[in-house]
Amino acid sequence: MQKLFFEKYKTSEVTNTRSVINTPSAFTRKNFFHIQEAGYLKSLKSHLSRRSELNSYLFFVVLSGSGKVTYREPLSEGGMISSTAHAGDCFFLDCSGEYTHISTDEDPWELLWIHFNGPEARAYYTYFRDHHNWHFRSAHFTELINAIESIIRYNEEPTDDTDLL
């Protein structure tokens, strides 16, 4: 992370964080993949985050630190599955299923994340999951980080064509 990027973030007792929320046009929501929210989080101490039944897909990368992600995948009839997360790991979740994540006390994590949706998002997720696990490592980790950072920057000061970027 660039120092300038990090310095913009809000600090609490639990996290340093920055996120952008995007409200795309009705046309964009109907026709394209679109960003709903993207951000950066640095845990200062361990805390649990739990979500379910969101109309969204979440992709996040672990920049540093470690934690645990637990997930009930909607495409599966199984129960909750857990995975330990370390720097360099990637996660891709269908947020209509329940998920939790918590960083460790000993090595709090730093994440970049993006929530997105669109008319073909389910098909994209299903295709991805047919070929990969929801927790994985990518040979293109640096490019993924750069892409998410760019999305955050583009959406911090939206213009008329931000939806299309």
Describe the function of each predicted region.
Residues 1-34, 50, 154:
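A short, N-terminal "cap"/entry segment at the start of jelly-roll beta-barrel domains
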Residues 7-16, 121-124, 146-150:
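Short, charged, low-hydrophobicity "junction" segments
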Residues 6, 20-21, 35, 81, ...:
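Weak global preference for isoleucine
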Residues 11, 15-17, 21-28, 66, ...:
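Residue-identity detector for threonine
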Residues 123-165:
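Amphipathic alpha-helical segments enriched in hydrophobic/aromatic residues interleaved with Lys/Arg
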Residues 29-32, 115, 138-145:
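Alpha-helix N-cap/helix-start motif at coil-to-helix transitions, marked by capping-box chemistry
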Residues 30-132:
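N-terminal regulatory/effector-sensing and dimerization cores
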Residues 2-5, 13, 113, 117, ...:
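Short, isolated positions within intrinsically disordered regulatory regions of eukaryotic proteins
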